């Protein structure tokens, strides 16, 4: 805590208001509210805190405060300040997270559309739906039952949908506006859950079609009835009164909060919203902030009722939401709130379980590996592997794992420069010398452990370079594979010995991931280089074919095989002079296999030119 903060803490009033924490750059990193500014702000700089709060406090170099007349005014101000400044430590709901609605437009001839924007335009909106797929499923069903207008600008002729029975073609039909308004009301009733009338009508039409031997049409009506039944089963009935309501529940544990919102429409649960985030203040107050952001940020229809847990300030929620606010004490509504709370608890428990498994796989694995090898926890592990085929295009690759996870920005590729032929030991010596010679020259942070993809010979080579030539003290281990090319043994120590490592342990799985990753990275680089060298070598020595023209040929034909199959005329089209194109054909088809001069139509199969990209 610096002197500026100390002096400001003495000036804090006991009034309600908002406080604004800033970092060394003057950037707002957290906005909070308090019933008593003095007590709340001082609490950040006194006593111990959990890890996330310690992280926040460590960045605070200044703060400001704004006094308000009431707690509710402070709540509203806090929400606006968060929206305006987007502090990194505050609850932030994504502005672009919106839900789809089905809309009946307020037009002379209404349309049925899906939209994510709710406007005061006289249209009828139904939803929200969990995703656009669910909304489309319902709309497709409605399109089959109700032939609304489909075109934005109706043509003088009938549209495609008219021919498949999904548009009335109002530009030529005799139906008046009242008919379409009546149809809009039927859709409205259907989307409100009042679908029995429509089902009865469809059953009547199905029976009539069957009597007149129109069995295909009768089958269509049957399929529609079944589709409505399927839709009914997907929407769980939550309340008998068929009201539209949002049901809030939350649960807190270990400094984290989960808020669940049930969207109940016409008594049916059609979607839920789940958010998990760390909280820094009183959980009830952070919940209120969440509710304020929820209705402020989202394109969301405010329902008839909002149900909230018992211990939440009802008046504060009323200031945030223009709806009937209830804290149910018993009965069906109380059960809904309890269900939302239960689901919030389950979601939070699942998060912690996943975190524990993640820590076990990463942090726990490196800690166990350090204990097993009797070295400090290997936070940074660098691993090497060589790749070549009969000594051609020899390469090596290094992958880096930090805290048990790949750090791809630190990966490195090496072309072997000093070795002729297939010599894994010499290649390993060169690469280790290049890598750690640079670490030494530039005073880079060395790894906590080097893992060599290889046996005793490669590991000893690495030890010679690291310890004897460069004088560095870095632990080095080796990973040997079995005859099935699977991770088999871990070598470590001086002299090297097989480490007793359980094949079911997380540290074994970590080493396996490292070995698989470095092998993948090395072999991918080798394939890329070999492909490039093969292309270049076969086109080398052709007069008039320089690097630029080679590049243009590869860009156009994608592979050497395609160039070989191309006619002279096709090569000329790429910008290569005819005499050079003929030379290319002679070089690639040396035994009189050159293709005709005139290009013929050919099938352009998908090339494999890019299959080696990582």
Swiss-Prot record:
Top-level taxon of the source organism: Bacteria
Short name of any one Pfam family annotated for the protein: GIY-YIG
Keywords in alphabetical order: Cytoplasm, DNA damage, DNA excision, DNA repair, Excision nuclease, SOS response
Domain UVR, first and last residues per copy: 196-231
Protein name, UniProt field: UvrABC system protein C
GO biological process, one term: SOS response
Region feature (Disordered): 595-614
Lineage summary: Bacteria, Bacillati, Bacillota, Bacilli, Lactobacillales
Function: The UvrABC repair system catalyzes the recognition and processing of DNA lesions. UvrC both incises the 5' and 3' sides of the lesion. The N-terminal half is responsible for the 3' incision and the C-terminal half is responsible for the 5' incision.
Gene Ontology MF: a single term: excinuclease ABC activity
SMART domains linked to this entry: GIYc
Subunit comment: Interacts with UvrB in an incision complex.
Biological source species: Streptococcus pneumoniae (strain Taiwan19F-14)
Family of this protein: Belongs to the UvrC family.
InterPro entries cross-referenced by the UniProt entry: GIY-YIG_endonuc, GIY-YIG_endonuc_sf, GIY-YIG_UvrC_Cho, RuvA_2-like, UVR_dom, UVR_dom_sf, UvrABC_protein_C, UvrC
Annotated ranges, domain GIY-YIG: 14-91
Subcellular location: Cytoplasm
Cellular compartments per GO CC: cytoplasm; excinuclease repair complex
């Amino acid at each position: 805590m610096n002197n500026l903060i100390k002096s400001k803490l003495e000036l804090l009033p006991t009034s309600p208001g908002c406080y604004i924490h800033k970092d060394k750059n003057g950037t707002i990193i957290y906005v909070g509210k308090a019933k008593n500014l003095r007590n709340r702000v001082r609490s950040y700089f006194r006593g111990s805190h959990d890890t996330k709060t310690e992280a926040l406090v460590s960045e605070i170099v200044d703060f400001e405060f704004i006094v308000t007349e009431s707690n509710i005014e402070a709540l509203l101000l806090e929400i606006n300040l968060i929206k305006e400044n987007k502090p990194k430590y505050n609850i932030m709901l994504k502005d672009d997270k919106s839900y789809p609605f089905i809309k009946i437009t307020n037009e002379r001839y209404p349309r049925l559309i899906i939209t994510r924007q709710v406007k005061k335009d006289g249209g009828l909106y139904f939803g929200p739906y969990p995703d656009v797929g669910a909304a489309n499923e319902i709309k497709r069903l409605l399109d089959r039952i109700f032939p609304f207008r489909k075109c934005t600008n109706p043509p003088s002729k009938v549209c495609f949908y008219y021919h498949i029975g999904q548009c009335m073609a109002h530009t030529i039909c005799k139906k008046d506006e009242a008919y379409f308004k009546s149809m809009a009301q039927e859709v409205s009733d259907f989307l409100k859950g009042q679908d029995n009338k429509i089902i009865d009508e469809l059953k009547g039409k199905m029976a009539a079609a069957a009597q007149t031997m129109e069995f295909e049409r009768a089958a269509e009506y049957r399929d529609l009835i079944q589709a409505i039944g399927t839709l009914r089963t997907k929407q769980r009935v939550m309340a008998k009164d068929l009201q539209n309501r949002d049901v809030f529940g939350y649960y807190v544990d270990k400094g984290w909060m989960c808020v669940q919102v049930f969207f109940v429409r016409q008594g049916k649960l059609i979607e839920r919203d789940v958010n998990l985030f760390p909280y820094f203040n009183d959980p009830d107050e952070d919940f209120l902030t969440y509710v304020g952001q929820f209705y402020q940020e989202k394109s969301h229809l405010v329902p008839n009722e909002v149900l909230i847990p018992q211990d939440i300030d009802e008046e504060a929620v009323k200031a945030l939401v223009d709806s009937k606010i209830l804290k149910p004490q018993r009965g069906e509504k109380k059960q809904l709130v309890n269900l939302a709370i239960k689901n919030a608890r389950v979601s939070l428990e699942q998060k912690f379980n996943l975190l524990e498994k993640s820590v076990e796989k990463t942090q726990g694995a490196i800690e166990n590996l350090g204990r097993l090898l009797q070295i400090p926890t290997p936070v940074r592990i660098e691993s090497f592997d060589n790749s070549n085929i009969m000594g051609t295009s020899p390469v090596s690759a290094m992958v880096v794992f930090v805290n048990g996870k790949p750090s791809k920005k630190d990966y490195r590729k090496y072309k072997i420069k000093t070795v002729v032929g297939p010599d894994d030991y010499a290649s390993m010596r060169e690469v280790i010398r290049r890598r750690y010679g640079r670490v030494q020259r530039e005073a880079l942070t060395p790894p906590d452990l080097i893992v060599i993809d290889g046996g005793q010979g490669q590991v000893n080579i690495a030890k010679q370079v690291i310890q004897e030539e460069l004088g560095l003290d870095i632990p080095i281990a080796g990973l040997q594979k079995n005859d099935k090319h699977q991770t088999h043994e871990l070598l470590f120590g001086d002299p090297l010995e097989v480490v007793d490592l359980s094949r079911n342990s997380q540290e074994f799985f970590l080493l396996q991931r490292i070995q698989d990753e470095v092998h993948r990275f090395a072999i991918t680089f080798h394939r890329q280089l070999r492909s490039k060298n093969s292309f270049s070598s076969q086109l080398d020595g052709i007069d008039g074919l320089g690097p630029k023209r080679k590049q243009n040929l590869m860009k156009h034909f994608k592979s050497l095989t395609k160039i070989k199959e191309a006619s002279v005329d096709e090569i000329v089209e790429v910008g290569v002079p005819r005499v050079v194109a003929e030379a290319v054909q002679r070089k690639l088809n040396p035994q009189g296999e050159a293709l005709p001069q005139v290009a013929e139509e050919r099938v352009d199969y998908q090339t494999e030119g890019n299959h080696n990209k990582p």
